[in-house]
Amino acid sequence: MGRKGKVRAALAALLLLAGTAACGDESGPDARQPKKAGAAIRVDRPTALADQDVHVSVGGLRAHERVTVAAHAEDQRGHPWGASGSFTADAHGDLDLSRSAPRGGRPYTKPDSMGLFTAMLPRSGPGTKMIGSGDAFSYHPPSPAEQRTYDLRLTVSRKGKQLAARTLSREWLTGDVKHRKLTVARDRIEGELYTPAKGAHRKAPVLVFGGSEGGNSGEYAAALLAAHGHPTMSLCYFRCGKGSGRPDAIDMIDLRYFTRAAELLRRQPGADPRRLAVMGNSRGSEVAQLLGQRHPSVVRDVIAYAPSSKVNGPYLGGQVAWADGGRPVPTGPIPLNHVRGTVLAVAGGNDKMWGSAASARLIAARHNASGAPHRQVTYPRAGHHVNWFPYGQPGQEGGADGAVVSTSKADQAARQDGWARVLKLLD
């Protein structure tokens, strides 16, 4: 046998011994344990509406392994938001976020599969200066009119090394919902119209508008309601942008502008014209109640977030806030005895902007045209921003007691419970 032949024989012998040793290892007590392919993030709904929860778990970890789980997203300006927590896997190497709380109670204290979603804060950009200030701010992804979904990325890492990642799609609009931009020049109103597919079961149409922030802040809620089957419109009534034809102050804003929008909405496919509801937040709660009281033939139900029970003065100049057919609406308590349906007032007991909890109680003490009482729900530790939907609005605000973190967490809980009540009323 030549030199090359001897080398080949020696290598073959070594490989045979290695294979025998490996076979011997597999016959030991660990041979029956399946080999893990590595960490993996498991979710029950990779694509879900932005107001729907997702069950998140991680598998393929080592027994009792400590890892960091994080959520990441970008806002409409491309600035990153995120939240992360340290978690410990169980004896089987599994981690279920609905059963495990982050170590040290940060960024939230109790097991919650959606905890990282709602705990996100700005990671860079001007928003970081707002954290802990007590000033209100929240996450705004691209407008539903521009982008029907946004991405939320989950990652698992250990000591800075990424072990797993998964991107979830959070939907504002389902594929069968149609959108149309409304302008004062063409439609005599400024807003976004969302309609379900033709032939859909008729449901209550919903007209949504915000408060003193101006603009079209109700567009995310309107889009989600459309995804739930309701024809909706998010209406801008002031601060609608250059060239919009709308004023820049709450000054003689006429209820007929809102009823014009409501009449257009009532005619849409899938709309039950007898059941139209209006949804207003903060200063918008005033006009929502006025519409229910003064125009019951158009409006049935009213959802009033962080409400006032009275008409207040103008905002950013002027003489009176609201008008009806060109006539000023006087300041003072808003009667609700002509409302055809129900006023649902949703408030926070720690509201530093105004006494929305007291107003909610006053609203619930009043009765509609049939003699039935209106309703209210107050969340004692929540602040002014109890409005709209859960999960998709991380952010912060300070409460009347000065607390920021606890108020913001209470806001998130209020949105989850309050949104379910709103959907039930509308259905």
Language-model-detected regions and their locations in the chain:
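N-terminal cap/lid segment of alpha/beta-hydrolase-fold proteins
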Residues: R45-L49, V54, G60-E65, G78-A83, ...
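Mobile cap/lid helix-loop segments that gate and shape the active-site cleft of serine hydrolases
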Residues: R294-H295, V299-P335, E397
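Bacterial signal peptide processing site
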Residues: A21-E26
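Alpha/beta-hydrolase active-site loop
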Residues: D248-P269, E286, L290
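Short beta-strand element of the alpha/beta-hydrolase
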Residues: H201-S212
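Short beta-strand/loop motif that positions the catalytic acidic residue
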Residues: H338-R340, A345-D351
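C-terminal catalytic histidine-bearing segment of alpha/beta-hydrolase fold enzymes
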Residues: S370-D427
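Short amphipathic alpha-helix adjacent to the substrate-entry channel of hydrolases
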Residues: S217-C236
